[in-house]
Regions:
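Membrane-embedded transmembrane alpha-helical bundles that form the catalytic cores
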Residues: 1-465
């Protein structure tokens, strides 16, 4: 089931909210868990056992770790637990990648398994691993109630595409959370904002990308239009989902971590990754980079740590070489910045912004490429290589047709609208008017989104494939 679907908006969500708030306090987690299982199993119930197995592995492993008599036993059990928890992810997502590359290297013809990847497995696996490691470290106590732990992992607002919510983020709220009209109103506002990002901006930019892919008259201009459109689409698609997740979490009394903070306004790649998919970056920092020694090691080991972490980050996104190269590209850029470039970028902010936008755009072309060869063809075409025309009549038509949505997306990817709204609210006599206008705008946006959905087709979020 999708957040951006009529089934969810008209039927599931209202029923879920009604049953949840009618349920007594001690039953709310059970209602949330049952609703989440219905949400997850709506389209593909065959994947419910996979999620249940990962949840059970996480729950039982920490109970076993708690019985260990010494540190050595705990470490062995921790390693076994993490391997057990991550096995379904490796098997479902990466088995065919390893088989394909083994066949290429050895000349064998081992048949591919062709396993469909369970929705959200990359996200809920990382949540369970973080919980296991945190309990082992003594950062959080083990959750003794299996239903409460299952509700934490399977909670539908953040289940299929994050943010990656750590147990420590919401531990107290799982046991006792506060509900209020103000928090619920905030949640609705965030949800409608995210839904609008997805339906009214990301999906429309997706139409332009569809025209590019179907076109037989591609030009240099059209390649740049595609690259910019995809860069904006993936931001509004993913940040829109994160807004909806944070909003739904607030409706049910939870405070989920933010996942985006205007990443395209960054002046360095280091800053970009502090603003983009923040929960994933923090996960790799705390559970891979720091345990490897972080930067408190010899230079050669530090470089190795950087490359390993970013190769893993790329590989997490997909079982293909273009994702690995995408991660390694950022490893190289971050090493250059940390070695000598950062002081220069801090003094020359404009150059820093342009540098970030250029490499992030090139990175997303690699990210979206069907293969490394396809990526190279795109780059050559973007810079006028081969026999490609600079511009065609068809491409100009699409530029005129989508110019407004591209400009809207560019402005929306910056904090300018929020800052303008904040300044207007501070003016005397305007706050009440703006509050009413905001409510009316949100209602209009919601109705417009529903109208688009009624008239539209299946529109999954881009990050569902990861």
């Amino acid at each position: 089931m999708l957040f951006s679907s009529i089934t969810f908006l008209i039927y599931f969500l209202p029923c879920m909210v009604l049953v949840y708030f009618l349920a007594p306090g001690r039953m709310k987690n059970t209602v949330l868990l049952l609703g989440s299982l219905i949400f997850y199993g709506w389209g593909e119930p065959k994947y419910l056992p996979v999620m249940a197995a990962v949840i059970l592995a996480g729950y039982l492993s920490v109970r076993l770790i708690g019985t260990c008599q010494n540190k050595r036993q705990s470490k062995i059990l921790l390693a076994a637990a993490v391997l057990l928890e991550i096995f379904p992810l490796i098997y479902c997502k990466y088995a065919d990648f390893f088989i394909q590359n083994l066949n290429v290297l050895t000349g064998q013809k081992i048949p591919l398994l062709r396993i469909a990847m369970p929705l959200g497995i990359s996200f809920y696996t990382f949540q369970v691993i973080s919980y296991t490691v945190d309990v082992y470290r003594g950062d959080v106590p083990a959750q003794k109630n299996l239903l409460t732990f299952a509700a934490y992992v399977a909670m539908f607002p953040q289940l299929v595409a994050g943010p990656i919510v750590r147990y420590s983020d919401i531990r107290s709220q799982l046991e006792n959370r506060m509900h209020s009209v103000e928090k619920c109103a905030y949640g609705i506002r965030r949800f409608v904002t995210g839904l609008s990002k997805k339906i009214l901006i990301a999906n429309v930019l997706g139409e332009l990308i569809g025209h590019f892919q179907a076109s037989e008259e591609k030009s240099v201009l059209f390649f740049w239009m595609y690259a910019i459109a995809f860069m904006l689409q993936i931001y509004f698609d993913f940040s829109g989902y994160s807004d909806m997740a944070v909003g739904l979490g607030a409706v049910f009394g939870f405070d989920f971590p933010e996942n985006f903070r205007y990443p395209y306004c960054s002046a360095s790649i280091t800053e970009f990754w502090r603003r983009w998919h923040m929960s994933l970056g923090a996960w790799f920092r705390d559970y891979l980079y720091i345990p490897l020694g972080g930067s408190h090691v010899k230079p050669v080991r530090w470089i190795f740590n950087i490359f390993l972490v970013w190769m893993a980050t790329g590989f997490w996104h997909g079982a293909a070489w273009n994702f690995i190269l995408w991660g390694l590209m950022y490893a190289v850029l971050l090493l250059i910045e940390k070695t000598w470039l950062l002081p220069y970028l801090k003094k020359h902010k404009i150059i820093g912004h342009l540098y970030v936008l250029f490499f992030v755009l090139i990175g997303f072309v690699l990210f979206d490429a069907s293969s490394v060869a396809n990526f190279w063809d795109c780059i050559v075409s973007m810079f006028g290589g081969g026999q490609i025309k600079p511009v065609t009549t068809e491409n100009l038509y699409y530029l005129k047709s989508y110019a407004v949505i591209i400009l809207t997306a560019v402005i929306g990817a910056t904090p300018l609208p929020a800052r303008l709204y904040g300044r207007l609210q501070k003016k005397k006599g305007l706050k009440q008017t703006l509050d009413i206008a905001e409510i009316l705008l949100l209602v209009m946006l919601l109705l417009l989104c529903v109208a688009f959905l009624v008239d539209g087709s299946f529109n999954p979020f881009l990050y569902f494939r990861f």
